[in-house]
Structure formats: C-alpha cells, structure tokens
Amino acid sequence: MDVLTSAADFKKSKVPQLQELDDLLRCHICKDFLKNPVLTPCGHTFCSLCIRGYLSNEPKCPLCLHELRESMLRSEYLVNEITETYKAARQRLLDELNSLETNQDNSVIEVVSDKEPSLLQIDDDVNENSNHITVNDTSDIIDEDNEIQITGTKRTARTILNGSRPTKAAKISDMFTTRKAKTEEKAPCPICSQLFPIRYLERTHLDECLTKPPTSSPPIKQSRLSPKPSESVSHVKRYLNSTNTSTQQRLPKLNFAKMTTSQLKQKLASLSLPVSGTRANMVARYNYYEMLWNSNFIDSINPVSESELRRQLMSWDASHNGNNNSSNGGTNTISQLMKMNSKNKGKEYEKLLKDFKKDSFDKKGWMLLHKNSFNRLLCDAKKTRRKTENETLMTSQSPRESSTQTELSAT
C-alpha cells in the first residue's frame, strides 16, 4: 500500500519553508504530487488525468473558474521532472532533518571532576582591581532528560591573590565538556580489503593481517568496495532531450447519440477493450480510456504501453462497473474474478484487491491465488483439444473404410 504523505510533514522541521514547496508540487484536485502536469491558459497546473476528468463534468478551471477546454491544455515537462526529482529525495530529506533535531536534543554536558566542585562564573561587571568572582549554588542542579539546568543565587567571594583569577577561569573552562556521538571513520585494509576503523587498522590490524596464514578463500577485490554507479534516471537529461515523438494519435471523443450499440462494440473491440456490460458501461469505459490514452501519449514525457493502459482501465472498470457487469450475466468479468476465493483467502484477497487498483499490482500473487482456476481451465482446454483431434481423425478415417468396403463388394 502506498504511503500517504502531506506537506505538513515539514511544518515542525528545521526548514518549515519546505512545506510550501511540497504543497506547490501537489495537484489541487487529487492533493497528490503532480503526475503528467499540464498548464492551463490561466496559468494553473494540474495532473493531466485529473483535469481531463474534471473538464468532462464542468468546462471551467477549478481555481479561477475561467472557461477551459481540453484542447487548451499544454504539457509541462519541466514541472514533471522537478516533481519526480523532489519525490525521489523527499523521504531522505525528511529523515536528515529529523536526525539533525534528534542529535541536537540528545547532546549531553558532562562534568569532569572526581568531586562535586563549585560552579564558578566570572563577574565582568565588577572592577578589575576587586577580583570578584561569582559562585553559583550547586544545590539547585536539576537533571531532566539528559539536560542539566543550573539555578541558584549568586554569591560574591574575594580572592586573596591577584594571580588566582586566570587560574580559576582555566579550571572553570575545564570543568565542562560537551560529549557528542562521533562515528569513527573506516578504511579498507590493503591486504584483506575489509573495513576497519583507521586507528585500529594502523596500530593493530595490519600486523595481524601480515602474520596470519592465508585462508582458502581469495581476497576480495577493491573494486567490490567501490560504490556502484547510480542507475536512477537523470531528470535533467530527460528534460533536455524531451520531445513529443509519440506516433500515437489523439483518441477522439465520440458522439454516442449517433452510434448504435453494435458500432460502439466495434469501436471498443478495435481498441482491444472489453465489450461486456450495458451500453452505459461501454460508454463510460470508452470515455475513461480516452482520458487515459490522451493523458499518457499526449502529455506524458515517459508514456507507458497500451497494455498498461488497459490494465489501468480494468482496475477502474472493476471498481465502477463491477455490479452492472455481473448483472449482465457475464462469467469472465474482472469483477467476478476479483470475488473468487474471497471467503477462503480473505486477507490475501483484500490485499490483492487494493493493489489491483494501483500501479503496484502483484501479478505473481494473483497467479498463486487463482492457480486452481488456471489449472482447471488448462485441463478443460486440453480435453477439448483431444476431443477435437479424435473427431477429426474419425472423420478422416470414415471415407477410407467406406471405399474399402465398396472394393470388397465389387470383387
């Protein structure tokens, strides 16, 4: 299941301005990050699929209510790459900010002394010749959550010797040290190529590694320790090389009032779309596929294949037209396949049902869930094939038998 994110995640971070950046990169309609963003003539940006679905109900901009049509939309490849880059770095950025706050909260002040010393503070307001110092009472020291809070009344003491002031100031500075968690740097051993702390490597490990007998396993090569080059997509290169080179044409809107049901089925069949359900189901199916098609091949910088579009349509069809399809008497509809084995495998079925409506559909899990049904279909197909082959063989042998019988009777 996808993790829900919100711009408010950065509200209490060290950089609260990132909340506005996170919010600006989200679609006003779906509240999620922009996907295949398009620009309107009035200067607003939405997801391509979101605004197309909105315009099918009301031909106005959702923000300023200016007149808007689908033909006015323009792709924004730059905003798409900015959004994808931010999405890839968002979680790491949030983790770094949270870890920074945690390290600052857990900083500890350690008092280095065998005995409980008096806490001294030099009073700069007094005359230099008076040699006054201020002593803080240590009876009111409160330790809460790894933090030391020092309170108390100030008492003034006169020193006897003039030279004692710098000595006491030096002692005061040595009484407090800040202890921070530091991770010791590591380096690979030039002999066994394993990582060790640098201090341990220089003082101890090198001598031990040189004197110990060689093992049967060959040493690890240095190239294995070097980080592999990143396989992530370069959004800068993709934007600079971006151009709409798709050979697919825009899918037109149809005038269903002038089309018969048979013509509508022919149109769906030409696009390899299911023709089950009522006429209203088929109209809704084509309208949604038209939005998917144009959003993908017209507005996307990285369009997916037609088979993926049909899978998304099947997911949408299962959640919107499922009841109507089953009432139509269909036996192989997606909605009925999703309901198979739901009683016996409830949790697994529910998880697949949720994932089926998203891009992260588990095909292997689906095959395992319906493995028995697939095997049954295979057995039925094999039986039908054998039966057909036997019938063909029998029909081919019958003319031969009749011809031999006529020859015998003639003799």
UniProtKB/Swiss-Prot annotation:
Belongs to the RAD18 family. InterPro entries: Rad18, Rad18_fungi, Rad18_UBZ4, SAP_dom, SAP_dom_sf, Znf_RING, Znf_RING/FYVE/PHD, Znf_RING_CS. It comes from Candida glabrata (strain ATCC 2001 / BCRC 20586 / JCM 3761 / NBRC 0622 / NRRL Y-65 / CBS 138) (Yeast). This is Postreplication repair E3 ubiquitin-protein ligase RAD18. It comes from the Eukaryota. The gene is RAD18. It is found in: Nucleus. A zinc finger (RING-type) spans 27-65. E3 RING-finger protein, member of the UBC2/RAD6 epistasis group. Associates to the E2 ubiquitin conjugating enzyme UBC2/RAD6 to form the UBC2-RAD18 ubiquitin ligase complex involved in postreplicative repair (PRR) of damaged DNA. Residues 209-234, 385-411 are annotated as: Disordered. Keywords: DNA damage, DNA repair, DNA-binding, Metal-binding, Nucleus, Transferase, Ubl conjugation pathway, Zinc, Zinc-finger. Residues 256-290 form the SAP domain.
